[in-house]
Amino acid sequence: MDLLTVEHLTKTYGTGENAVHALDDVSFSVPRGQFLAIIGPSGSGKSTLLHILGGVDRPTSGHVYMNGEDVYSRSDTALAIFRRREVGLIYQFYNLIPVLNVVENITLPVLMDGRKVNDARLQELLDTLGLRGR
């Protein structure tokens, strides 16, 4: 089974003469264990595609399947859980929450999910990233 399957994905912003077709009938699949690079010039729809794949923005039409499940058949609550547990988006200009320290920024998604922070894993991450003590 493919990890990700995209079928006939379209995304249109606006209507009529002002319509912008960011994605037009995009289809592809990514087998489990494979990597995918999305490249193209500015304005070609890369960010729009990634937002739709990550459950941040809904497509105008088409389907996104993750592990065989249609991402957009989920309720808004289930979609929020999907984003929190299954998706990691790192933006070019990421924004940390300025009133939180490094540990609080790292652990926030885990705590929002109602789970206990694995302190050993947290320390391993801090060491790997060279952020211990910050």
Name what the model sees in each region.
Residues 100-109:
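Short coil-to-helix segment of the ABC ATPase nucleotide-binding domain corresponding to the Q-loop/switch region
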Residues 1-3, 12-25, 76:
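A short, flexible loop at the N-terminus of ABC-type nucleotide-binding domains that lies
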Residues 39-41:
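The feature captures the beta-strand-to-loop junction immediately N-terminal to the Walker
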Residues 17-20, 71-88:
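ABC ATPase NBD coupling module
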Residues 54:
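Helix-to-loop junction immediately C-terminal to a conserved catalytic motif
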Residues 62-70:
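Conserved ABC transporter NBD signature motif
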Residues 69-70, 117-134:
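Conserved ABC ATPase "signature" region
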